[in-house]
Amino acid sequence: MSNSVNISVETTCENQIREIGYDGTELYQPPPTLSESLAKCAARIDFSKTSLDDLKKEEKSAAAAADEDKDATQFQESLWPWDAVRNKLKDALTEICVLSDVISIAKDKRYLVLDPLLEEADDTKPIVQVYSRKKAISQAAQVLLSGAERLRNAHSEQRNRNVSDFHIELLRLRQNWRLKKVSNAIIGDLSYRTAGSKFGMSGTFEVTKAEETGDEDTASSSNSSSSVSGNNGMQLKASSALRVIVPAELQGVAYIKVITQKDQEDLCTAQLNLMGHGPNITAQVGVWQKTLEFAQNVLFCKELFAQLAREAIQLQAPIPHVVIGNQIRATLLPNIQLIISLCHSTTFDSSQPAPINDHDHVLEHSLHQLLREVHYKNSHHPFPHPASAPLGPTKKRMLAGPMAADRETLLDMTKSQTILEQIIAQAQHIFMRKRTQYVLDTLARDVKDPQIVSHWNAMNSPTMSCVKINIVTHGYDAIGRTSLVIHVKERSLKCICRDGRVMRLSYEPQELRDLILCQINSHQISCLISLARCMSWTVLSNSNHLGIGKVEPLGNASSCLLASPNSDRMIAVQIRCDPQIDVKVYIARSPRQDFFPSPLVPEKLWENLGGTFKEVRFDKIEGKSFLNKMEFLMASLTSNTA
């Protein structure tokens, strides 16, 4: 055929190409051997699918086939009687032989290995891994170097730039203060209206962009309008892209000074401002931060003073409060006044006195907390219960009817204390507590026998404190001790004795001193009675309120009459408060040594009535304390009797 075309035919590549050389030669992977083919086929078998269900299905199918064979052979007669037995034995022998072969193969492992075979992994050259890792590391290094270069450039630009970015500063300002845009101006608010304040003074300030000029006059005017002298009088100098303009009435430094005076003598002083006591102020970002902090502090002090002045005028006190200019005067106790002053200065004077170190942090915290409560009540009104009820009454007053509240309870619900009343109450309590401490410390120092131990409760309220007083004698603690609890209130004291008696004292310190001295008298008598019983002496009589003798300047005299075990000695003890503890001891002897019969008293038995009492020089008796001396005295009289 002249039109025939030559066609090149290539056989299909049955083997995989393992490698291609640089000259184009192809290296094929040799075909797998029989053992490798068998291993691959065995690896493809999923032995987990050969479950009991498959075996049961095969048994059912075999049983069905056997039933069909039986039906077919029922019509044929058996050629040989033992044909069925022979077939059963043959099948059993076949199964046993197969089982024996499987066991032998699995045991010897010469013909078949049951261990799983892993496929051969592709051979990778180490140099390829090295090159790939090197390339990945170089890419990561390039990313890090580019990021570091960008940071370096940004840092150098920020260092070379004298004026910070306006938008960044504005973002920081918005994170700390409330701002809004009115037309083309940016207005901020320093007031506490969002917290519930109703103070009328405006706290708005304006934010503008600082002029980028090198003129010193412009810079000085910008600094004067956007910076305020601190507590230490140093001017804040820093470059900023913002200029904060605050009202003239909010510029400067303000604080509230609280002084308590007694006869023109300062007893306690506290300075209150929004940023804490002293010149330590938390450093914030930007000059505007301190400017706004000082301005808000001025607004806070003026609002607090205005609230206190309004309450001082409205309150009806026994001694009216006086409000003169920036000063409020209130009477705490007789000859003790509370003076609250508002100090506001726009310039720093080096001749001003240094701040007083006696700062009352409790009073400062109370003023902050009380003003916060006023703001909270202004913004948080109780919801009506039920919803159709009028606004205003609290939930307790709503439930007063169903709960059958009495008139006194209803009056208590309507009572509320103002900030000034609570501050006056706290100040009165502070003075009562200091007076009580002074009286107890003075008595503990002056009275050596017995010992007076005071335990002040650490958990107290702002208007009430608690102190427990233990009166004990050294060495005789087990015999007896006298305890009493004193509740220190605003203008009074409440004393609870061990026997349950409750006494209410006024603010005079002399009343508390007299009470402690009377408790010392009763303690000495009660401990003496217990000691006498331990030494087998008889207590004939005792009294804490002796009604004979001269009238004591304070309290009552206490006495005790003791008799020896043989009733031949008697001891009379008298303790008075004049104004210190005065102890007198008398001794009488029975029978009387100076008894002589007379016509009126002829019998001698009347000599056992006892003689006259003779006073003992008690200070000359050996002993460290009153009970120790009495113990020695009773012991000596008992031994003389024996």
From Swiss-Prot:
Q: What is the lineage of its organism?
A: Eukaryota, Metazoa, Ecdysozoa, Arthropoda, Hexapoda
Q: Where is the composition biased (Low complexity)?
A: 220-232
From the UniProt record, report the name of the gene that encodes this protein: MED17
What are the annotated GO cellular component locations? core mediator complex; mediator complex; nucleus; pericentric heterochromatin
The Swiss-Prot or TrEMBL record describes its family as follows:
Belongs to the Mediator complex subunit 17 family.
Is Magnesium one of the keywords UniProt gives this record?
no
**InterPro entries, A to Z:** Mediator_Med17
Query: Can you say what this protein is called?
Result: Mediator of RNA polymerase II transcription subunit 17
Please describe the quaternary structure of this protein.
Component of the Mediator complex, which includes at least CDK8, MED4, MED6, MED11, MED14, MED17, MED18, MED20, MED21, MED22, MED27, MED28, MED30 and MED31. Interacts with Hsf.
